[in-house]
């Protein structure tokens, strides 16, 4: 289930993004960027609709997914 990022308290969203950035690894490319810059980049992706906050009912977890990686079959469990 997609959770609108605008509905999440600012501090909670900041912590969620920060945790996501830490989990995603350390691909610095040619120029190393700060943790806060990475957080800011994710905020831009959320605002542009290129990333989304997703709640997995099956796993009872919240995550940030890029639009390209989002698979709705992994977030919902259909009992039909």
Swiss-Prot record:
Look up and give the organism this protein is from.
Answer: Aliivibrio fischeri (strain MJ11)
InterPro entries, alphabetized: UPF0270, YehU-like_sf
Its protein name is UPF0270 protein VFMJ11_0205
Signal peptide stretch: none
What does the sequence similarity comment in the record state about its family? Belongs to the UPF0270 family.
Return any one Pfam family short name: UPF0270
Q: Please list every transmembrane segment annotated in the UniProt record, as residue ranges.
A: none
């Amino acid at each position: 289930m997609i959770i609108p990022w605008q509905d999440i308290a600012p501090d909670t969203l900041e912590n969620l993004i920060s945790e996501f950035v830490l989990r995603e690894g350390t691909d610095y490319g040619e120029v190393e960027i700060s943790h806060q810059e990475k957080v800011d980049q994710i905020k831009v992706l959320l605002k542009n609709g290129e990333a989304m906050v997703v709640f997995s009912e099956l796993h009872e977890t919240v995550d940030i997914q890029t639009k390209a990686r989002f698979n709705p079959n992994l977030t919902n469990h259909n009992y039909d």
